[in-house]
Amino acid sequence: MKVTFQVPSITCNHCVDKIEKFVGEIEGVSFIDASVEKKSVVVEFDTPATQDLIKEALLDAGQEVV
């Protein structure tokens, strides 16, 4: 599954690195594309990963998800 999350709080490459670290730790995540310019994060994943787990990881990384 491929999902795009709108994350308006992404402001720099440090944010991107932190997002990639937190979301990348979730089993089942196969691709992450966090964009400062688009203020979005595209994630491809399979079970056991879920949208809720990814959203929680984004929040744990200090980001706001809308």
UniProtKB/Swiss-Prot annotation:
<dbReference type="InterPro" id="IPR006121">
    <property type="entry name" value="HMA_dom"/>
</dbReference>
<feature type="binding site">
    <location>
        <position position="12"/>
    </location>
    <ligand>
        <name>Cu cation</name>
    </ligand>
</feature>
<dbReference type="InterPro" id="IPR036163">
    <property type="entry name" value="HMA_dom_sf"/>
</dbReference>
<dbReference type="InterPro" id="IPR006122">
    <property type="entry name" value="HMA_Cu_ion-bd"/>
</dbReference>
<keyword id="KW-0479">Metal-binding</keyword>
<dbReference type="InterPro" id="IPR017969">
    <property type="entry name" value="Heavy-metal-associated_CS"/>
</dbReference>
<protein>
    <recommendedName>
        <fullName>COP-associated protein</fullName>
    </recommendedName>
</protein>
<dbReference type="GO" id="GO:0005507">
    <property type="term" value="F:copper ion binding"/>
</dbReference>
<dbReference type="GO" id="GO:0006825">
    <property type="term" value="P:copper ion transport"/>
</dbReference>
<comment type="function">
    <text>Part of a cation-transporting system which is associated with copper export out of the H.pylori cells.</text>
</comment>
<keyword id="KW-0186">Copper</keyword>
<feature type="domain" description="HMA">
    <location>
        <begin position="1"/>
        <end position="66"/>
    </location>
</feature>
<feature type="binding site">
    <location>
        <position position="15"/>
    </location>
    <ligand>
        <name>Cu cation</name>
    </ligand>
</feature>
<dbReference type="Pfam" id="PF00403">
    <property type="entry name" value="HMA"/>
</dbReference>
<dbReference type="InterPro" id="IPR000428">
    <property type="entry name" value="Cu-bd"/>
</dbReference>
